[in-house]
Amino acid sequence: MSHLVKMENGQSQTIQEMLGCIERYNPDHLKTLEAYVQDQAKNNTYDLEANLAVLKLYQFNPHMLNFDITYTILLKCLTNLPHTDFVMAKCLLLPQQMKDENVQTIIDLADILERADFTLFWQRAEVNRNMFRHITGFHDSIRKFVSHVIGTTFQTIRKDLLKELLGGIEDSTLESWVKRNGWKHQGQGLVVVATQDDKIKTKNITEKIEFENVGALMAQCL
Protein backbone atom coordinates (compact mmCIF):
# COMPACT_ATOMS: atom_id res chain seq x y z
CA MET A 1 0.00 0.00 0.00
CA SER A 2 1.41 3.38 -1.06
CA HIS A 3 1.21 6.16 1.51
CA LEU A 4 1.18 9.71 0.19
CA VAL A 5 1.57 12.79 2.36
CA LYS A 6 -0.49 15.86 1.50
CA MET A 7 1.50 19.10 1.60
CA GLU A 8 0.10 22.55 2.46
CA ASN A 9 0.41 23.56 -1.20
CA GLY A 10 -1.97 20.78 -2.18
CA GLN A 11 0.72 18.56 -3.70
CA SER A 12 1.48 15.04 -2.51
CA GLN A 13 4.78 13.41 -1.64
CA THR A 14 5.78 9.86 -0.83
CA ILE A 15 6.80 9.19 2.75
CA GLN A 16 10.42 8.79 1.65
CA GLU A 17 10.36 12.21 -0.03
CA MET A 18 8.73 13.79 3.01
CA LEU A 19 11.34 12.31 5.35
CA GLY A 20 14.06 13.99 3.31
CA CYS A 21 12.86 17.50 4.05
CA ILE A 22 11.68 19.71 6.91
CA GLU A 23 8.17 18.29 6.57
CA ARG A 24 9.27 15.25 8.59
CA TYR A 25 8.72 17.38 11.71
CA ASN A 26 5.19 18.43 10.74
CA PRO A 27 2.72 16.80 13.17
CA ASP A 28 0.02 16.94 10.50
CA HIS A 29 1.74 13.94 8.88
CA LEU A 30 1.74 11.80 12.02
CA LYS A 31 -1.47 9.91 11.22
CA THR A 32 -0.10 8.93 7.82
CA LEU A 33 3.15 7.73 9.37
CA GLU A 34 1.27 5.75 12.02
CA ALA A 35 -0.77 4.04 9.32
CA TYR A 36 2.52 3.23 7.58
CA VAL A 37 3.80 1.58 10.78
CA GLN A 38 0.66 -0.57 10.92
CA ASP A 39 1.17 -1.59 7.29
CA GLN A 40 4.73 -2.66 8.06
CA ALA A 41 3.43 -4.93 10.81
CA LYS A 42 0.76 -6.40 8.54
CA ASN A 43 2.87 -6.88 5.42
CA ASN A 44 6.19 -7.89 7.03
CA THR A 45 8.05 -4.84 5.72
CA TYR A 46 10.32 -2.49 7.61
CA ASP A 47 11.29 1.19 7.42
CA LEU A 48 13.47 2.27 10.33
CA GLU A 49 13.75 5.91 9.26
CA ALA A 50 9.99 6.36 9.13
CA ASN A 51 9.52 4.63 12.47
CA LEU A 52 12.13 6.79 14.19
CA ALA A 53 10.43 9.85 12.69
CA VAL A 54 7.21 8.80 14.44
CA LEU A 55 8.98 8.56 17.80
CA LYS A 56 10.59 11.96 17.20
CA LEU A 57 7.18 13.50 16.49
CA TYR A 58 5.94 12.05 19.78
CA GLN A 59 8.84 13.82 21.51
CA PHE A 60 7.79 17.14 20.01
CA ASN A 61 4.07 16.49 20.47
CA PRO A 62 3.57 14.31 23.57
CA HIS A 63 -0.18 14.98 23.51
CA MET A 64 -0.31 12.94 20.28
CA LEU A 65 1.43 9.91 21.79
CA ASN A 66 0.03 6.54 20.68
CA PHE A 67 1.22 3.65 22.85
CA ASP A 68 0.05 0.91 20.47
CA ILE A 69 2.16 2.40 17.68
CA THR A 70 5.08 2.67 20.11
CA TYR A 71 4.82 -1.05 20.89
CA THR A 72 4.72 -1.94 17.21
CA ILE A 73 7.78 0.17 16.40
CA LEU A 74 9.81 -1.37 19.22
CA LEU A 75 8.80 -4.90 18.27
CA LYS A 76 9.64 -4.26 14.61
CA CYS A 77 13.07 -3.11 15.77
CA LEU A 78 13.53 -6.47 17.48
CA THR A 79 12.88 -8.20 14.17
CA ASN A 80 15.98 -6.50 12.75
CA LEU A 81 18.50 -7.76 15.29
CA PRO A 82 21.50 -7.87 15.46
CA HIS A 83 21.35 -4.30 14.12
CA THR A 84 21.14 -1.54 16.74
CA ASP A 85 17.71 -0.27 15.69
CA PHE A 86 16.16 -1.05 19.07
CA VAL A 87 18.78 1.03 20.90
CA MET A 88 18.11 4.01 18.63
CA ALA A 89 14.36 3.72 19.12
CA LYS A 90 14.70 3.36 22.88
CA CYS A 91 16.73 6.57 23.03
CA LEU A 92 13.77 8.49 21.56
CA LEU A 93 11.22 7.32 24.12
CA LEU A 94 9.54 9.81 26.42
CA PRO A 95 9.51 9.26 30.21
CA GLN A 96 5.85 8.25 30.09
CA GLN A 97 6.67 5.67 27.43
CA MET A 98 9.54 4.27 29.49
CA LYS A 99 7.24 3.90 32.51
CA ASP A 100 4.65 1.96 30.51
CA GLU A 101 4.36 -1.70 31.54
CA ASN A 102 4.24 -3.04 27.97
CA VAL A 103 7.25 -0.97 26.95
CA GLN A 104 9.17 -2.41 29.90
CA THR A 105 8.13 -5.91 28.83
CA ILE A 106 9.49 -5.29 25.33
CA ILE A 107 12.72 -3.87 26.75
CA ASP A 108 13.08 -6.99 28.89
CA LEU A 109 12.57 -9.17 25.80
CA ALA A 110 15.26 -7.19 23.99
CA ASP A 111 17.69 -7.65 26.90
CA ILE A 112 17.01 -11.40 26.93
CA LEU A 113 17.71 -11.63 23.20
CA GLU A 114 20.89 -9.58 23.45
CA ARG A 115 22.31 -11.92 26.08
CA ALA A 116 21.27 -14.89 23.92
CA ASP A 117 19.04 -16.53 26.52
CA PHE A 118 16.77 -17.84 23.79
CA THR A 119 15.00 -20.49 25.85
CA LEU A 120 13.84 -17.81 28.30
CA PHE A 121 12.88 -15.51 25.42
CA TRP A 122 10.49 -18.05 23.91
CA GLN A 123 8.96 -18.68 27.32
CA ARG A 124 8.34 -14.95 27.82
CA ALA A 125 7.15 -14.60 24.24
CA GLU A 126 4.51 -17.26 24.82
CA VAL A 127 3.24 -15.47 27.91
CA ASN A 128 3.05 -12.17 25.98
CA ARG A 129 2.02 -13.61 22.60
CA ASN A 130 -0.94 -11.23 22.21
CA MET A 131 1.49 -8.31 22.16
CA PHE A 132 2.95 -9.21 18.77
CA ARG A 133 0.21 -11.33 17.27
CA HIS A 134 -0.47 -8.53 14.74
CA ILE A 135 3.15 -8.50 13.51
CA THR A 136 3.45 -10.79 10.52
CA GLY A 137 6.66 -12.84 10.49
CA PHE A 138 7.70 -11.87 14.02
CA HIS A 139 8.67 -15.37 15.15
CA ASP A 140 10.62 -16.17 11.98
CA SER A 141 12.47 -12.84 12.20
CA ILE A 142 13.59 -13.73 15.71
CA ARG A 143 14.56 -17.23 14.54
CA LYS A 144 16.70 -15.61 11.85
CA PHE A 145 18.58 -13.73 14.57
CA VAL A 146 18.87 -16.88 16.68
CA SER A 147 20.28 -18.70 13.65
CA HIS A 148 22.83 -15.93 13.21
CA VAL A 149 24.01 -16.32 16.81
CA ILE A 150 24.09 -20.11 16.53
CA GLY A 151 26.12 -19.82 13.32
CA THR A 152 28.77 -17.70 15.05
CA THR A 153 28.84 -19.79 18.24
CA PHE A 154 28.59 -23.48 17.35
CA GLN A 155 30.34 -25.88 15.01
CA THR A 156 27.96 -28.70 15.87
CA ILE A 157 24.83 -28.63 17.99
CA ARG A 158 22.44 -31.24 19.30
CA LYS A 159 19.24 -31.42 17.31
CA ASP A 160 17.06 -31.22 20.42
CA LEU A 161 18.91 -28.12 21.65
CA LEU A 162 18.63 -26.50 18.23
CA LYS A 163 14.87 -27.04 18.21
CA GLU A 164 14.64 -25.53 21.69
CA LEU A 165 16.68 -22.44 20.78
CA LEU A 166 14.51 -21.87 17.71
CA GLY A 167 11.38 -21.83 19.82
CA GLY A 168 10.44 -25.46 20.38
CA ILE A 169 9.76 -26.05 16.69
CA GLU A 170 8.64 -29.29 15.07
CA ASP A 171 10.98 -31.52 13.05
CA SER A 172 9.46 -30.37 9.76
CA THR A 173 10.06 -26.72 10.64
CA LEU A 174 13.58 -27.54 11.78
CA GLU A 175 14.33 -29.07 8.39
CA SER A 176 13.44 -25.83 6.64
CA TRP A 177 15.75 -23.84 8.91
CA VAL A 178 18.59 -26.33 8.49
CA LYS A 179 18.23 -26.02 4.73
CA ARG A 180 17.88 -22.24 4.83
CA ASN A 181 21.10 -21.81 6.79
CA GLY A 182 23.11 -24.39 4.86
CA TRP A 183 23.51 -26.64 7.90
CA LYS A 184 23.76 -30.43 7.65
CA HIS A 185 22.70 -33.42 9.72
CA GLN A 186 25.69 -35.40 10.98
CA GLY A 187 23.89 -38.31 12.58
CA GLN A 188 23.66 -39.25 16.25
CA GLY A 189 21.27 -36.34 16.77
CA LEU A 190 23.80 -33.68 15.74
CA VAL A 191 23.60 -30.83 13.25
CA VAL A 192 26.75 -29.41 11.67
CA VAL A 193 26.58 -25.62 11.79
CA ALA A 194 30.10 -24.80 10.57
CA THR A 195 32.89 -27.01 9.24
CA GLN A 196 36.60 -26.40 9.59
CA ASP A 197 36.66 -25.02 6.06
CA ASP A 198 34.02 -22.44 7.00
CA LYS A 199 36.24 -20.86 9.63
CA ILE A 200 37.77 -17.52 8.85
CA LYS A 201 41.42 -17.94 7.96
CA THR A 202 43.89 -15.33 9.12
CA LYS A 203 46.12 -13.75 6.51
CA ASN A 204 49.31 -11.79 6.94
CA ILE A 205 49.32 -8.58 4.95
CA THR A 206 52.57 -6.79 4.25
CA GLU A 207 52.37 -3.16 3.21
CA LYS A 208 55.37 -1.37 1.77
CA ILE A 209 55.76 2.13 3.21
CA GLU A 210 58.13 4.48 1.43
CA PHE A 211 60.40 6.80 3.44
CA GLU A 212 58.88 9.92 1.93
CA ASN A 213 55.51 8.89 3.32
CA VAL A 214 56.77 9.17 6.90
CA GLY A 215 59.63 11.62 6.48
CA ALA A 216 57.58 14.65 7.43
CA LEU A 217 56.24 12.90 10.53
CA MET A 218 59.73 11.85 11.63
CA ALA A 219 60.98 15.41 11.17
CA GLN A 220 58.34 16.66 13.59
CA CYS A 221 59.55 14.19 16.20
CA LEU A 222 63.15 15.45 16.13
Swiss-Prot record:
Record carries keyword Transmembrane helix: no
Function: Component of the eukaryotic translation initiation factor 3 (eIF-3) complex, which is involved in protein synthesis of a specialized repertoire of mRNAs and, together with other initiation factors, stimulates binding of mRNA and methionyl-tRNAi to the 40S ribosome. The eIF-3 complex specifically targets and initiates translation of a subset of mRNAs involved in cell proliferation.
An annotated GO cellular component: eukaryotic 43S preinitiation complex
GO BP annotations, alphabetical order: formation of cytoplasmic translation initiation complex; regulation of translational initiation
InterPro entries per the UniProt record, alphabetical: ARM-type_fold (IPR016024), CSN8_PSD8_EIF3K (IPR033464), eIF3k (IPR009374), PCI_dom (IPR000717), Transl_init_fac_sub12_N_euk (IPR016020), WH-like_DNA-bd_sf (IPR036388), WH_DNA-bd_sf (IPR036390)
A Pfam family that the UniProt record links to this protein: CSN8_PSD8_EIF3K
UniProt lineage: Eukaryota, Metazoa, Ecdysozoa, Arthropoda, Hexapoda
Subunit structure: Component of the eukaryotic translation initiation factor 3 (eIF-3) complex. The eIF-3 complex interacts with pix.
Name recorded for this polypeptide: Eukaryotic translation initiation factor 3 subunit K
GO MF assignments: ribosome binding; RNA binding; translation initiation factor activity
Family label: Belongs to the eIF-3 subunit K family.
PCI domain: residues covered: 46-208
Keyword Cytoplasm among record annotations: yes
Subcellular location: Cytoplasm
Keywords: Cytoplasm, Initiation factor, Protein biosynthesis
